[in-house]
From Swiss-Prot:
Region described as Disordered: 173-202
Record's protein name: Lytic polysaccharide monooxygenase-like protein X325
Gene behind the chain: X325
Cofactor: Cu(2+)
Residues carrying sugar: 156
UniProt xrefs under InterPro entries: BIM1-like, BIM1-like_dom
Keywords of the record: Cell membrane, Copper, Glycoprotein, GPI-anchor, Lipoprotein, Membrane, Signal
Its job: Lytic polysaccharide monooxygenase-like protein that has diverged to biological functions other than polysaccharide degradation since it does not perform oxidative cleavage of polysaccharides. Acts as a cell surface-bound protein that functions in the copper-accumulation pathway. May also act as the major cell wall sensor that regulates MAP kinase-dependent hyphal anastomosis, the fusion of hyphal cells.
Amino acid sequence: MASLRSVLAAGLLLLSTTANAHFELQHPSPLTAESSSQATAPCGGANADIDQNTATDFHVEGDYVQLFNGHAQGNWLIRGTLDPKAGGDWEQLFPIVQQTGRGNFCEPVVTVPGEWAGKKGFLGISGNAGDGILYACAAVNFVSGSAPAPGGSCVNGSAVTASFQPDDTLSALVGSSSNSGSSGSETTAPAPAATTSQPSAAAPMMGERVSFGSFALTGVMLLVGAALL
């Protein structure tokens, strides 16, 4: 039988690995699902090349952005660029939002400049969640019109709230903002989805997912219990 020390060590490793999870871009489809390199700009370590990446349609008059956050709190910058390598010329597409609570976060209406319709580029999510800036990108075809999320899919976790929150570190990652006015003016963007969305009615693993911390803690307790038998 494994010693109590080895079992506890395995449990602590599980807790550490799970608690350090970052975030997952769910829509549009990300360039990579790998989270270990998310601190690498501009796209979380993924190879950004619009001629090679598989692109998802994103509607310039309004489309949804959905992600899963493994942190208790994080600020999100939604930005876009027509640079074929995602190397620069990033524009802010939505005011910076602070998410409080682990789980799903969905913004149902994100717009981009109308002149981008018919072009390819990248939509990027940059997060400031207390352990450095994290990045994820999606290759997209910017198309005309708008596209609401499929029914019931763009909802926030039951423990998630959101509000607009300035973040100078994230603001420094863009050259201009398509939805923000000039200095001193107010944004015309809609309020964050969390102020109006209803929590997911789906089971936790399908809707908001189980909290990383609670899952890990349960695993550690089971391991310790097994060692004491």
